[in-house]
Amino acid sequence: MQAKNPELSVIILNYNTKELLEDCLNSVKAHMDEVPMEVIVSDNASTDGSPEMVKKKFPWVKYTEGANEGFSKGNNRARPLVDGKMVLFLNPDTVVHKDVFLKTVKYLKEHPDVGAVTCKLVLPNGKMDKDIRRRFPTPWISFQRLVLGMNRAYWYEDIPENETHEVDAIQGAFILTWKKILDKVGWYDENYFFDGEDVDLCYQIHKAGYKIIYYPETTVTHIKGVTKGKVAKWKYKVTPQQRKRLRLAGVISMERFFKKNLWNKYPVIFDYFVIFGINVFKIVRYVKVTLLSSY
């Protein structure tokens, strides 16, 4: 089933999403003839029978597993198994449609100035997943979004969703890039546990001199929210403690991203003001998730 000399390595990180992972793998399998490719599943200590399902129903898939140490480490765990020149990070809560591999790989190969590309992600209700194209969370963009509730700039709502264009960041649910670029920038930063690692990776790709492209000429369905335990329909559960950690992860990642990438780009007093604001937001988020988890 796997290509002997794959052009593309598809990495799927799984944590207790057995049914969705099976659907995802079936959709990938249906379109593997589009590009010489291999599929790698990295499992973060699932307990729902996912590992057994993969080994039984998809014996041709390369498989690796380890402790649940987060999104970054889980994806990076697959690195030694990669034989393709291109790497696609794909979420298990996605369904791949016709020509996705063919068109996105073709686009990346034909544009040497592009370091990463994504397709259009569509939610089950037919609407676009807006997080697929984002601007970097600079202080001004973050202030508009978190304080003023204005997401238009953050989500590129000033540009039609069916128009191919350059963006700051794309979502970790579908990131196609070159392995040589990942090796250059160091793959995912493992200091991020969950949330923010995809934005940081895009930032490093930009720093390396490449463009990030949103390419809506082909689509993938994204059952969004599953990895955060928000979609009960799929019978995916997380404990209240896990849910609290996941909801706080975004704020923690926000602080990490700012300190790593934006610190010293502004006056020092402004840097500390931003960190103060993030920590206030962290406290508010902590109180909120603590109260919600008690019900």
Residue ranges and their predicted role:
Residues M1-A30:
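N-proximal low-complexity "stem/linker" segments adjacent to membrane-targeting elements
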Residues V95-D131:
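Conserved donor NDP-sugar-binding/catalytic core segment of glycosyltransferases
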Residues S27, D43-P51:
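A conserved acidic beta->alpha catalytic loop
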Residues F136-D168:
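Short, flexible, basic/aromatic active-site loop/helix in glycosyltransferases
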Residues V87:
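Short aromatic/hydrophobic "clamp" motif used to bind/position activated sugar donors
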Residues N162, D168-T221:
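A short, conserved alpha-helix in the catalytic core of glycosyltransferases
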Residues K207-L292:
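Active-site-adjacent helix/loop segment of glycosyltransferases
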Residues T64-V82:
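Glycine-rich, basic loop-to-helix element that forms the pyrophosphate-binding segment
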